[in-house]
């Protein structure tokens, strides 16, 4: 007996293939940068971009396999979780940037705890959303699907709250270091202003994407956003591709410290 399709529309092969190609190229670019700079804490960018590549590839393949549950689960899970991995590297970069500028006293949270607190919260969001996606993909009833959507919604809301708290830490640090620059901010090799600007851009894009997902799941499976394909590409795929493009110029290995400076790759 043939399985019933979980797709409310026929996934586009063309758009899916385009996004798969874009994310594959971005994965290669990030991998090259990673090994050239040795910034191993940026590995979540690579893993997340691989998730996106496989996820959109699965969407494209689903055009001719709409009844395939494995393909449906694969694309739903990987595309949902990839931005959480991007956020993990964003969180880790702020702490290293604070250390590089010698401005630890300007952070409202001890620098050694920034990564632990926010990446820990990120892992929690990952687990919640993964559980919700699993429940949703395997549900055979409306009640089961609603439970899965509610769990995902909870994970997304927690992620937004954590991200807003992170932005508060970044903004306060930014304000303090601009009003009272440290000696290390004069070092031309430490492009802290550019990196903070890019951090804000990336954070806003990820937040917009998360808000889109909240609205999408809050509206339910019969809502416009889940019933149509274009929103996921405009408010998720394109935004996350921009995030990866921006962050490809953001590897802190380019800010090579002197021997007496704090290593940006340290925890």
Model-derived segments and their meaning:
Residues 1-83, 87, 96-99, 106-115:
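Membrane-proximal first intracellular loop
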Residues 3-5, 137-146, 182, 221-223:
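Membrane-interface helix termini and inter-helical loops of multi-pass transporters
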Residues 13-17, 72-84, 129, 146-163, ...:
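Extracellular loop 3-seventh transmembrane helix
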Residues 24-31, 80-107, 123-137, 161-178, ...:
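Cytoplasm-facing ends of alpha-helical transmembrane segments in multi-pass membrane proteins
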Residues 38-39, 65, 141, 228, ...:
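Short, solvent-exposed helix-helix connector turns and helix-capping sites enriched
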Residues 52-63, 129-140, 170, 206-220:
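Helix-to-loop junction signature of class
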Residues 175-191, 250-267:
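Intrinsically disordered, low-complexity terminal tails of fungal membrane proteins
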């Amino acid at each position: 007996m043939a399985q019933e399709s979980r797709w409310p529309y026929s996934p586009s092969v063309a758009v899916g293939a385009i996004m798969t190609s874009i994310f594959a190229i971005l994965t290669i670019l990030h991998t090259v940068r990673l090994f050239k700079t040795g910034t191993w804490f940026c590995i979540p960018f690579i893993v997340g971009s691989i998730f996106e590549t496989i996820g959109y590839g699965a969407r494209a393949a689903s055009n001719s396999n709409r009844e395939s549950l494995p393909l449906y689960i694969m694309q739903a899970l990987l595309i949902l979780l990839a931005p959480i991995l991007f956020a993990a590297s964003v969180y880790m970069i702020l702490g290293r940037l604070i250390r590089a500028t010698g401005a630890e006293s300007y952070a409202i949270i001890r620098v050694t705890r920034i990564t632990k607190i926010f990446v820990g919260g990120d892992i929690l969001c990952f687990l919640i959303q993964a559980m919700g996606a699993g429940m949703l993909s395997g549900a055979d009833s409306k009640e089961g699907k609603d439970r899965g959507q509610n769990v995902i919604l909870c994970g997304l809301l927690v992620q937004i709250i954590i991200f807003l708290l992170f932005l508060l830490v970044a903004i306060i640090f930014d304000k303090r270091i601009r009003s009272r620059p440290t000696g290390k901010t004069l070092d031309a090799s430490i492009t802290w202003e550019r990196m903070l600007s890019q951090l804000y851009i990336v954070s806003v894009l990820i937040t917009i994407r998360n808000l889109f997902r909240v609205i999408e799941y809050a509206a339910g499976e019969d809502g416009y956003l889940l019933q149509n394909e274009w929103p996921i590409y405009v408010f998720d795929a394109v935004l996350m591709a921009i995030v990866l493009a921006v962050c490809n110029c953001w590897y802190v290995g380019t800010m090579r410290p002197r021997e007496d400076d704090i290593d940006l790759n340290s925890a």
